Amino acid sequence: MLHAVSPPPPTELPQAPARIVLGVYLRGLRQAKGETLEAAARAAGQSASAVSRWERAESPISPAAVQRLLLHYGVAKQHVDYLVRSLPPQDYTRSEHEEQGYAKRAPFDHWADVAGEEAMARYIAVMRTASEILQFCVQVPAGLRTQAYQEAVLDPAVCVTADEPVLGLPRWVHTITWAQGQRRTVLLDETVLTKPAGGYEVMGGQLRHLAELVSGEDADAGGLVIRILPMSQILFVHTLHWPAEVTLHGHRLVTGLGLFPSYESGSRAARTVSAGLREALSAACGREETHQLLVRAAHTMERRAAS
């Protein structure tokens, strides 16, 4: 039976997800172009400090400035127009709007980014540049994969939405690296231990790699934490597609990935996802048990590969 999750009350003034993701996009485009804040400011007709605030989603940006900057960075007009339509008005204040429905959403709390390859590039940039991540995965996620496993799961024959900068995605996203000092907690569904993605040999190597990462965890320094989530109970996160809570420049939002990325902040729905992820973290195996499960599963895969 699915365990119900009660969201906590709101504790912060949320920023609209589209503004947060736009900020990541603007910074990624600027840095890929090799431009300084001052150069971007000249293109936008604003100050360097204003551009910096836009990139950190600390202040609203006008539609005209969005258009000037994105066209300056070489973004196609159809994608520029799409982003301008997605943003809240420059004078939008969430507290002035009533929350609607069971999800308790204000008008711009949820954003489904349906812009195809540009949307996937933005999602990759969000995950790579976040200062903190808490995520639940039914497959080993980006950043933790061996080369052989990555090739298997990103094979176009089986992969609908690539969460790595693969050939065909916009050039700028290939320059985005994982943030230094990122605090990332990955909850892996227990089924990962038994699904031989890429074959037994490939999966055995991947599980060994995960076990080594768990062995190298530094509890004092933070950084990467990997835990196995047992199948002994059905939790709220099991109903979601690649749920994660990420923090970018102090802004917290939840993300999901199905046929396209989605983002949410501020709403009851967003708080419920966050609470569900924390419930899953509490139910996950400890470090030692996670390591034992990974080693045991790797041994099983390797034995089957040799038979």
Question: What is each model feature region?
Answer:
Residues 2-24, 32, 38-42, 49, ...:
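Interdomain hinge/linker segments and adjacent boundary elements that couple functional modules
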Residues 35, 46, 224:
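Short glycine/serine/threonine/alanine-rich loop segments
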Residues 199-307:
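C-terminal regulatory/effector modules of DNA-binding transcriptional regulators
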